[in-house]
From Swiss-Prot:
Name of the encoding gene: TOP1
Gene Ontology biological process terms from the UniProt entry: chromatin organization; chromosome segregation; DNA replication; DNA strand elongation involved in DNA replication; DNA topological change; mitotic chromosome condensation; nuclear migration; rDNA heterochromatin formation
Identification of the protein by name: DNA topoisomerase 1
Modified residues (Phosphoserine): S14, S15, S24, S49, S76
Function (record text): Releases the supercoiling and torsional tension of DNA introduced during the DNA replication and transcription by transiently cleaving and rejoining one strand of the DNA duplex. Introduces a single-strand break via transesterification at a target site in duplex DNA. The scissile phosphodiester is attacked by the catalytic tyrosine of the enzyme, resulting in the formation of a DNA-(3'-phosphotyrosyl)-enzyme intermediate and the expulsion of a 5'-OH DNA strand. The free DNA strand then rotates around the intact phosphodiester bond on the opposing strand, thus removing DNA supercoils.
Subunit-level organization: Monomer.
Catalytic site: Y727
Species of provenance: Saccharomyces cerevisiae (strain ATCC 204508 / S288c) (Baker's yeast)
Region (Disordered), start-end ranges: 1-132
Gene Ontology MF: a single term: DNA topoisomerase type I (single strand cut, ATP-independent) activity
Length: 769
C-alpha cells in the first residue's frame, strides 16, 4: 500500500470504544454447546446482504487476457501492408548513360544480389520464427504444449578419490575411508575455515549423516572406529583442496578459455529444447551435485548431506513421439511421462526436505513469460476491488466474531505493511514468520498506537519496523495479546493463510495475500515514478528511478547485508572522482598558461584551482603510476600466455622494459609539475576553447560518477533486484525508459531484457499499471 493509501485507510477506520471486546469474551458463562451454535451462526458468510460485495461475487469471471483493466496492456499486431501496393518506377532521364559491364562483373553482381536476397530471407525467417505469444490469445491454459523434445539433464561427474596420502585423521591416526564416505568428509573439509564449519548445528548434522554413509559403505577400511566429531582432523584434506584451488588460479587466460569453450560445446545440446516446433532455452538443465546443505539464517537442517541424484531418481517429461534421451551408461531413467498440462522437462525428489526439484524452461521462454504476465495482470486486476476490500476490513475491525476481527487486522497488516501471509512451520524448518504466524513475542505495543514488529521473515531475514497503526488496529492487537496468552502463543490463533486466502477469493477469483504484495509494490512504483520530473541527465534520471525502486524494496523488506568489498569499492570510486577533479584543475592551469588575463576576467571559473594540496596531488600521482605499472605487467603476462598457447614466439623482457620506460617518463613529468606548478602543454591544448571543452566533459564525468557513488551507497543494504524482478510490473520500467528517454539497457540487464521482452514490446509511454 502506498503512503497516501495507508493514510486514507487509517483516516477511514473508526476509533470508537464501543464493542471492542469480541462476543466470545463477553459471553464466557454460556454453555459450550450454545457458544458453538452462536459462533457458527455469527461466522457465516457476512456479505450475503452487502450489495457492493454481492455484485462482485456474482460477477461472471473472465479470462485475464481478455478482461479490460483501465487500458489495454497489449496492443494489436501492426496492420499488414497492402499486397497491391507497388513501388513507383523511376523515369529514366535522357542524360542517363547505360554503362556496359563485363561478364565477370555481371557474375559478381549476380552473386552479390543472391547473397543479399539470402540474407533478407534469413532475417525474414528469423522474424517469422520468433514467437510473440503476447500478441496471441491462449484459448486453453491447461494445455502447456503440444510437442516437447529435449535431451535430458547433465549429471555431475563421478567422485574422484583423493591421492592415497591425503586422509582424514582420527585421534592422530589416518583413516582409510571408502570412496562414498571420503566424498562426504571432503565436503566438510572444503569448508573448514568457513563460518559454517564452526556452527555446532552444522557440525552435528554433518557428522550424523557422515556416520550413516560410513555405515552404508562398510565402515573404515583399516578398522578405525569413528565415534566423536571433536576427534576428527580434516586439516590434510583441507590443505589439499586449497592447493587444488591455487593450481586452478595459475591457469592462463587461454587455458581457462579453452576449458570454458569445451564445457559450452558439451552443454549446447542440453541448453535448448523444442517446444511446439520452436527452439526454446532451458533453465537449470544440470542436476545439483552432492554437497552439504547450507540454508539461510539459523536453519535447523544446515550441514545435512544432499545426496547424489542418479538417473533412476529422475522422471523425464516429453511428447509421446519424441525420442527418449539415452540415460548414462549402466543406468536407466526412473520414469518417462507425457504430461502436457505441466511445464517441467524433468523432476526428482531431493532428500533434505523430501520435496521435488524441477527442470523448467529459462526465464526468457514463452511459458515463463506468460506466467509473469498473468501474475502482474492479476495484481493489476486487484485495483478494481481494493476499495471494497478496504471498506470491509475497516468495518470488520469491530466485528463481534473473533475470527472476523483477526481476518480484518491480518488483511490490514498485509495491505499497509506488505507482510507475507505466513504459515505454520515444522520443527525441522527454519523459524521464519509471516502475518498469520506472528507470535506474542514478535509484536510489542507502545501506546497510544505504535507497534514494533521484530521477527525473522523469509530466508531468515530480520523484519524490524516501528510503525504507527490505526487506533482500532492497536486495540485489537492489545486484545489478541491478553492473558492467558504469553510468549510462544499465536497472535492470530484462529487464522491461517488458507482461511485468509479462501476469504479473499470471495472478492476476486485467484486473489491471495501474495497478490497484495505485487499490487502494492507496483502501485507504489507507479506513484513514485509520477513524481519524477522529466529533466536532467540520464544519470540523474536513473538515480531517481533507483530511489523509487528503493522505496518499494523497503516496503517489501528486501534487505541485503553489506558486501565485504563495499568499503573498498567506495574508496576506489572516491579516488576516481578525486582524479577527475585533479584532471580538471590541470586543464584550468593550462588555460592560464595560455592566457593569464583570464584569471581576472573569470575569477569564479578558476576558484577551485587550489583545492588540492601538494600532498593530495602527490598521492594521486602515485596511484596513477602504480596503476600504469600494474597494467603493463599484466599485459606482458597476458600476451605471453596467449603466444605460449598458440605456440608463437614470446615477447622479450625488453618489451616490458620499453613499456615501463614510458611510465617512468610520465612519473618525471608529474614530479616536475608538482615542483613548478606548471602543466606540460599537450599538442591538443593549443587553444583556450579546446581546453574549456575538455573541462566541460570532465565536469559531466564527475557529476555522473558522484551520482553513481551516491546510488551505490544508498543501496548498499537494500536489494533493488528482488523487487524489480519479482514484484514491480516490468512494464512500469519500460514506460519510464520510453517517457524519459533513458536507454532500457540502463535499467534492465541483458538477461532481464530477454525475460521481459513481452513488456518491452507491448506498451508505450502512456501505459498505466
Amino acid at each position: 500500500m502506498t503512503i497516501a493509501d495507508a493514510s486514507k485507510v487509517n483516516h477511514e477506520l473508526s476509533s470508537d470504544d464501543d464493542d471492542d471486546v469480541p462476543l466470545s469474551q463477553t459471553l464466557k458463562k454460556r454453555k459450550v454447546a450454545s457458544m458453538n451454535s452462536a459462533s457458527l451462526q455469527d461466522e457465516a458468510e457476512p456479505y450475503d446482504s452487502d450489495e457492493a460485495i454481492s455484485k462482485i461475487s456474482k460477477k461472471k469471471t473472465k479470462k485475464i487476457k481478455t478482461e479490460p483493466v483501465q487500458s489495454s496492456s497489449l496492443p494489436s499486431p501492426p496492420a499488414k501492408k497492402s499486397a497491391t501496393s507497388k513501388p513507383k518506377k523511376i523515369k529514366k532521364e535522357d542524360g542517363d548513360v547505360k554503362v556496359k559491364t563485363t561478364k565477370k562483373e555481371e557474375q559478381e553482381n549476380e552473386k552479390k544480389k543472391r547473397e543479399e536476397e539470402e540474407e533478407e530471407d534469413k532475417k525474414a525467417k528469423e522474424e517469422e520464427e520468433e514467437y510473440k505469444w503476447w500478441e496471441k490469445e491462449n484459448e486453453d491454459d491447461t494445455i502447456k504444449w503440444v510437442t516437447l523434445k529435449h535431451n535430458g539433464v547433465i549429471f555431475p561427474p563421478p567422485y574422484q578419490p583423493l591421492p592415497s596420502h591425503i586422509k582424514l585423521y582420527y585421534d592422530g591416526k589416518p583413516v582409510d575411508l571408502p570412496p562414498q564416505a571420503e566424498e562426504v568428509a571432503g565436503f566438510f573439509a572444503a569448508l573448514l575455515e568457513s563460518d559454517h564449519a564452526k556452527n555446532p548445528v552444522f557440525q552435528k548434522n554433518f557428522f550424523n549423516d557422515f556416520l550413516q554413509v560410513l555405515k552404508e559403505s562398510g565402515g573404515p577400511l583399516n578398522g578405525i572406529e569413528i565415534k566423536e566429531f571433536s576427534r576428527c582432523d580434516f586439516t590434510k584434506m583441507f590443505d589439499y583442496f586449497q592447493l587444488q584451488k591455487e593450481q586452478k588460479k595459475q591457469l592462463t587466460s587461454q587455458e581457462k578459455k579453452q576449458i570454458r569453450l569445451e564445457r559450452e560445446k558439451f552443454e549446447e545440446d542440453y541448453k535448448f529444447c523444442e517446444l511446439d516446433g520452436r527452439r526454446e532455452q532451458v533453465g537449470n538443465f544440470k542436476v545439483e551435485p552432492p554437497d552439504l546443505f547450507r540454508g539461510r539464517g539459523a536453519h535447523p537442517k544446515t550441514g545435512k548431506l544432499k545426496r547424489r541424484v542418479n538417473p533412476e531418481d529422475i522422471v523425464l517429461n516429453l511428447s509421446k513421439d519424441a525420442p527418449v534421451p539415452p540415460a548414462p551408461e549402466g543406468h536407466k531413467w526412473g520414469e518417462i511421462r507425457h504430461d502436457n498440462t505441466v511445464q517441467w522437462l524433468a523432476m526428482w525428489r531431493e532428500n533434505i526436505f523430501n520435496s521435488f526439484k524441477y527442470v523448467r524452461l529459462a526465464a526468457n521462454s514463452s511459458l515463463k513469460g506468460q506466467s509473469d504476465y498473468k501474475k502482474f495482470e492479476k495484481a493489476r486486476q486487484l485495483k478494481s476491488y481494493i476499495d471494497a476490500i478496504r471498506r470491509d476490513y475497516t468495518r470488520n475491525l469491530k466485528s463481534k466474531v473473533m475470527l472476523e476481527r483477526q481476518k480484518a487486522v491480518a488483511i490490514y497488516l498485509i495491505d499497509v505493511f506488505a507482510l507475507r501471509a505466513g504459515g505454520e512451520k515444522s520443527e525441522d524448518e527454519a523459524d521464519t514468520v509471516g502475518c498469520c504466524s506472528l507470535r506474542y513475542e514478535h509484536v510489542t505495543l507502545k501506546p497510544p498506537n505504535t507497534v514494533i514488529f521484530d521477527f525473522l521473515g523469509k530466508d531468515s531475514i530480520r523484519f524490524y519496523q516501528e510503525v504507527e497503526v490505526d487506533k482500532q488496529v492497536f486495540k485489537n492487537l492489545t486484545i489478541f495479546k491478553r492473558p492467558p496468552k504469553q510468549p510462544g502463543h499465536q497472535l492470530f490463533d484462529r487464522l491461517d493463510p488458507s482461511i485468509l486466502n479462501k476469504y479473499l477469493q470471495n472478492y476476486m477469483p485467484g486473489l491471495t495475500a501474495k497478490v497484495f504484495r505485487t499490487y502494492n509494490a507496483s502501485k507504489t512504483m507507479q506513484d513514485q515514478l509520477d513524481l519524477i520530473p522529466n529533466k536532467g541527465s540520464v544519470a540523474e534520471k536513473i538515480l531517481k528511478y533507483n530511489a523509487a525502486n528503493r522505496t518499494v524494496a523497503i516496503l517489501c523488506n528486501h534487505q541485503r547485508t553489506v558486501t565485504k568489498g563495499h568499503a573498498q569499492t567506495v574508496e576506489k570510486a572516491n579516488n576516481r572522482i578525486q582524479e577527475l577533479e585533479w584532471q580538471k584543475i590541470r586543464c584550468k592551469r593550462a588555460i592560464l598558461q595560455l592566457d593569464k588575463d583570464l584569471l581576472k576576467k573569470e575569477p569564479k571559473y578558476f576558484e577551485e584551482i587550489d583545492d588540492l594540496t601538494k600532498e593530495d596531488e602527490a598521492t594521486i600521482h602515485k596511484r596513477i603510476i602504480d596503476r600504469e605499472i600494474e597494467k603493463y605487467q599484466r599485459k606482458f603476462v597476458r600476451e605471453n600466455d596467449k603466444r605460449k598457447f598458440e605456440k608463437e614466439e614470446l615477447l622479450p623482457e625488453s618489451q616490458l622494459k620499453e613499456w615501463l620506460e614510458k611510465v617512468d617518463e610520465k612519473k618525471q613529468e608529474f614530479e616536475k609539475e608538482l615542483k613548478t606548478g606548471e602543466v606540460e602543454l599537450k599538442s591538443s591544448w593549443n587553444s583556450v576553447e579546446k581546453i574549456k571543452a575538455q573541462v566541460e566533459k570532465l565536469e559531466q564525468r564527475i557529476q555522473t560518477s558522484s551520482i553513481q557513488l551516491k546510488d551505490k551507497e544508498e543501496n548498499s543494504q537494500v536489494s533493488l533486484g528482488t523487487s524489480k524482478i519479482n514484484y514491480i510490473d516490468p512494464r512500469l520500467s519500460v514506460v519510464f525508459c520510453k517517457k524519459y528517454d533513458v536507454p532500457i539497457e540502463k535499467i534492465f540487464t541483458k538477461t532481464l531484457r530477454e525475460k521481459f521482452k513481452w513488456a518491452i514490446e507491448s506498451v508505450d509511454e502512456n501505459w498505466r499499471f
